[in-house]
Amino acid sequence: MAGKSSLFKVILLGDGGVGKSSLMNRYVTNKFDTQLFHTIGVEFLNKDLEVDGHFVTMQIWDTAGQERFRSLRTPFYRGSDCCLLTFSVDDSQSFQNLSNWKKEFIYYADVKEPESFPFVILGNKIDISERQVSTEEAQAWCRDNGDYPYFETSAKDATNVAAAFEEAVRRVLATEDRSDHLIQTDTVSLHRKPKPSSSCC
């Protein structure tokens, strides 16, 4: 892409095992790996795209969902432009924990205006037939907690994955002053963002 692009930092949060790494890899590489291990700490991948005429470099951060990795993941919340809160539709506990993930992010990211911060909610693993969280339950949570957009996704068959990430970009574009994010696309520098201290597939 020629000219100027916007660099957006998007972070995936949610319980371990809900498919955050698979969603990131499906979107960036269009691949699904059944052998992915739980993330240790954080890792990120970049994706260049055009949304509604805007050229964007999306820096997608995947975080470890296990409680014991909290000290590793929370320093990387700062500077995020959007947060994708993720649960698995076949795991009701991961859905119930969304509020805790939201609170953790707002606190450690030092979000100044939580009411207007762009969150997108993902209900992953809809390819699994036996689900514990209904579409209506998830939609009601989104309405009650900030009228957030909700996508039911499957990293396995790519259902709604691209649509969810593109909506995240739209939400950022609608709320952010893009002048703070402009970069030259032919010399993309990520030095202003922290690098992961530890990562795993």
Curated annotation (Swiss-Prot):
Cysteine disulfide links: none
Binding site for GTP: G17, V18, G19, K20, S21, S22, T34, H38, T39, G65, N124, K125, D127, K156
Pfam families: Ras (PF00071)
GO biological process: positive regulation of exocytosis; protein transport; Rab protein signal transduction; receptor-mediated endocytosis; regulation of protein localization; retrograde transport, endosome to Golgi
Binding residues for GDP: G17, G19, K20, S21, S22, N124, K125, D127, A155, K156
Cofactor: Mg(2+)
SUPFAM superfamilies linked to this entry: P-loop containing nucleoside triphosphate hydrolases
MF terms (GO), sorted A to Z: G protein activity; GDP binding; GTP binding; GTPase activity; identical protein binding
Membrane topology: Lipid-anchor
UniProt activity-regulation remark: Regulated by guanine nucleotide exchange factors (GEFs) which promote the exchange of bound GDP for free GTP. Regulated by GTPase activating proteins (GAPs) which increase the GTP hydrolysis activity. Inhibited by GDP dissociation inhibitors (GDIs).
Role description: The small GTPases Rab are key regulators of intracellular membrane trafficking, from the formation of transport vesicles to their fusion with membranes. Rabs cycle between an inactive GDP-bound form and an active GTP-bound form that is able to recruit to membranes different sets of downstream effectors directly responsible for vesicle formation, movement, tethering and fusion. RAB9A is involved in the transport of proteins between the endosomes and the trans-Golgi network (TGN).
Protein name: Ras-related protein Rab-9A
Organism: Canis lupus familiaris (Dog)
Gene transcribed to yield this protein: RAB9A
